[in-house]
Amino acid sequence: MYNGVLLLHKPVGMTSHDCVMKIRKLLKTKKVGHTGTLDPEVSGVLPICVGRATKIVEYLTEKSKTYDAEVTLGCSTETEDQTGEVTEKKPVLAPPDEQTVQSVLRSLEGTIEQVPPMYSAVKVGGKKLYEYARAGIEVERPKRTITIHHIELTSEIRHEGDKARFRFVVTCSKGTYVRTLAVTIGEKLGYPAHMSNLVRTASGPFTLDECLTFEDVEGLIADGTLSEKLVPIERALDHLPKWIISDTLAKKVENGAVLETPGSFSHLTSEDRIAVFTEAGRCTAVYYPHPTKTGLLKPAKVLVQKSEQ
């Protein structure tokens, strides 16, 4: 049985769900789930939780993401990326200089509001926005607050015919639409624009150079060494506060017991989570402050069973 996080280099042309289904077939298990959707035309880091690690999916989806994106100035599309029909054109006679572009990018750093694109899976009135879009209906979309941690120009600005292109790297919070960001960048530069290429280079602490292709996965399965390449749950939860417990407490944890909050964690809020480790270094559960009983911690996820201790 495989347990851990498989860092997949998602190829262009597959949905995230397609990737999960293929991994299920390759590993011969239904216990597989991804940690954040990538559109079919986007490649890059797609962490896939396998086996017992499917219990920690929600703690990985919250992490920031890093993307390498290309913006094309001179035309916008209905999908805000290279796959959609062109909706507006404006020839780029003289492209903006690097200083101007960098200034626009820097103006987006911090907390900003973003309206999700019509071609997205965000739900409004019980339906996904892309369902309205495909029916030719445009609906009002609620603004979302996102955080741009860092954004930077990474290429020269290329003037190609009546268009201009450049690349940038952005590290942003969960829920950020980089194609909408590309449109916003274009607006600030005075042109209709769209995102013409996107690669996710990092998801939380996981980077592209750690990822496996499907071909890699198949080879490792054949060699019997795939388990060695899976990220252990312990590393995957490294961003959470760590509580090392005694073997006596570990017995209670495996039974899902409510525990007293140690003094070092008395400052926690209801949103915080703690990774509980045994003295041997194994992560056995994730706990959080009890919603109604002050001074107590309650299990959010128990990651081991008695038979596994």
UniProtKB/Swiss-Prot annotation:
Pfam families: TruB_C_2, TruB_N. It catalyses: uridine(55) in tRNA = pseudouridine(55) in tRNA. Its EC number is 5.4.99.25. One of its GO terms (biological process) is mRNA pseudouridine synthesis. It comes from the Bacteria. It is an enzyme of class 5 (isomerase). The keyword tRNA processing applies. The keyword Isomerase applies. Belongs to the pseudouridine synthase TruB family. Type 1 subfamily. NCBIfam families: TruB. This is tRNA pseudouridine synthase B. It comes from Bacillus licheniformis (strain ATCC 14580 / DSM 13 / JCM 2505 / CCUG 7422 / NBRC 12200 / NCIMB 9375 / NCTC 10341 / NRRL NRS-1264 / Gibson 46). The gene is truB.
